[in-house]
């Protein structure tokens, strides 16, 4: 009877019914280890199916292996911040995808991120609120973004409520190269600002307005890993993540500083390529400007050798300094210091020439004064002519008439002509007579 019951059990009851049969009730001469390979596979399948129907805690083998951790946490681990977890150690598909990432059409990239083993990755409760995205967001990432520009807006007045997000928030594109990481960070920060998380992002001029919550940190870790695969991250980003794989804010802060540095580098290279000098400014100021640019570029990892630097400088010389383009073109080992030495020498010669010209130049006022002054060789005094023109009313006729009358008759009405004929003649008429031509 017992043997019939044993034969009625299917292989599915391998983990339950077979366990109730003792060794005394089984009468067989078959070696228990002598089992065919097909039987073993059937037993394994049956055991797996039976375990999947149970409501106990899932085995750790059902969770995908995390490449970033050698020994994953167990179900009994507790978070020092959020208290004990629920029975499930790993997040289910719904918990790992609370924001509806399937709308982006990339469900294969959603499951279990490298950050899920961190205690900070688990939400504090089963009903954590994340920004929900409508199904219309599932457009190809190559389409133009509705947000124009990559500039960072002031997010100090951004709403921190995670439940009320903007509509049509476009996700950042996928990072495909380490060289494009800084450009990708611009779009990622824009994505966080549109998701009402702009007040937790530091800028180049100020720190973050507030500290992020655990849910917000979970959201940052998940989206950062989702859109920036680890194989495309720069080395300095991997170094930060190796020390603390949840320190996304440090990565964003350092990226913003690098963006500011890159902007200065572009400005310095542009200034160096558009140099212009003609001697209108001191040579010391021109040398200091060029030297500061070269030092900044060298400190930022963009060294410029002497040959290239001299080419930039000589290209900007004009006027008399243009001669230095051809005077130094045969020197192979010419340095920037040698070129500036020639510029200083030419500038000093130019300034000395200007000073000499100003010394020998005659003053126009002095020339005008000399034209009106005559020196008498016989007499020590000089005679200066009257600068005013004679009155038109006393013409030549009147003066001639006065001379003729004074020669014919002498009287008290007329003054005698004093001095020699070579001296200036001055006539005085106390009656102030004005004669017209033809009246005498």
Curated annotation (Swiss-Prot):
Induction: Ty1-NL1 is a weakly expressed element. Induced under amino acid starvation conditions by GCN4. Disulfide bonds: none annotated. Residues 153-165 have a biased composition (Low complexity). It is found in: Cytoplasm. Residues 1-23, 48-60, 71-86, 131-152, 373-412 have a biased composition (Polar residues). Keywords: Cytoplasm, RNA-binding, Transposable element. The keyword RNA-binding applies. The record marks 401-402 as: Cleavage. Residues 1-86, 131-171, 350-425 are annotated as: Disordered. GO terms for cellular component: cytoplasm. Capsid protein (CA) is the structural component of the virus-like particle (VLP), forming the shell that encapsulates the retrotransposons dimeric RNA genome. The particles are assembled from trimer-clustered units and there are holes in the capsid shells that allow for the diffusion of macromolecules. CA also has nucleocapsid-like chaperone activity, promoting primer tRNA(i)-Met annealing to the multipartite primer-binding site (PBS), dimerization of Ty1 RNA and initiation of reverse transcription. The C-terminal RNA-binding region of CA is sufficient for all its nucleocapsid-like chaperone activities. This is Transposon Ty1-NL1 Gag polyprotein. The gene is TY1A-NL1.
């Amino acid at each position: 009877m017992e043997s019939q019951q044993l034969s009625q059990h299917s292989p599915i009851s391998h983990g339950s019914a077979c366990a109730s049969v003792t060794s005394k009730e089984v009468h067989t001469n078959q070696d228990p280890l002598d089992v065919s390979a097909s039987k073993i596979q059937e037993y394994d399948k049956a055991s797996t199916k039976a375990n999947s129907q149970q409501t106990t805690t899932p085995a750790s083998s059902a969770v995908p292996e995390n490449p970033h951790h050698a020994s994953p946490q167990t179900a009994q681990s507790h978070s020092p911040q959020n208290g004990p977890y629920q029975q499930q150690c790993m997040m289910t598909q719904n918990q790992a995808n609370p924001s509806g990432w399937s709308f982006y059409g990339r469900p294969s990239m959603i499951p279990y991120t490298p950050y899920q083993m961190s205690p900070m990755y688990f939400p504090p409760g089963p009903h954590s609120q994340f920004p929900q995205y409508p199904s219309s967001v599932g457009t190809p990432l190559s389409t133009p973004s509705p947000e124009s520009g990559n500039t960072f807006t002031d997010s100090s007045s951004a709403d921190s409520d995670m439940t009320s997000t903007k509509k049509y928030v476009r996700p950042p594109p996928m990072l495909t190269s380490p060289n494009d990481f800084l450009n990708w960070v611009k779009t990622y920060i824009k994505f966080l600002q549109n998701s009402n998380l702009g007040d937790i992002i530091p800028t180049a001029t100020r720190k973050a307005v507030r500290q992020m919550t655990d849910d917000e940190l979970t959201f940052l870790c998940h989206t950062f890993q989702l859109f920036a695969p680890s194989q495309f991250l720069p080395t300095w980003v991997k170094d930060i993540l190796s020390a603390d794989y949840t320190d996304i804010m440090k990565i964003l802060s350092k990226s913003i500083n690098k963006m500011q540095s890159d902007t200065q580098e572009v400005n310095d290279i542009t200034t160096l390529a558009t140099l212009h000098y003609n001697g209108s400014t001191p040579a010391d100021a021109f040398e200091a400007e060029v030297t500061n640019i070269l030092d900044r570029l060298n400190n930022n990892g963009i060294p410029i050798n002497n040959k290239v630097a001299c080419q930039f400088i000589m290209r900007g010389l004009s006027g008399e300094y243009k001669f230095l383009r051809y005077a130094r073109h045969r020197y192979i080992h010419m340095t920037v210091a040698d070129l500036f030495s020639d510029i200083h020498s030419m500038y000093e010669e130019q300034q000395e020439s200007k000073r000499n010209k100003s010394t020998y130049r005659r003053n126009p006022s002095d020339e005008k004064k000399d034209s009106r002054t005559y020196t008498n060789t016989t007499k020590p005094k000089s005679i200066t002519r009257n600068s005013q023109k004679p009155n038109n009313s006393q013409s030549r006729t009147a003066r001639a008439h006065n001379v003729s009358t004074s020669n014919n008759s002498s009287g008290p009405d007329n003054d005698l002509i004093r001095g020699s004929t070579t001296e200036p003649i001055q006539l005085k008429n106390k009656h102030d007579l004005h004669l017209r031509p033809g009246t005498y």
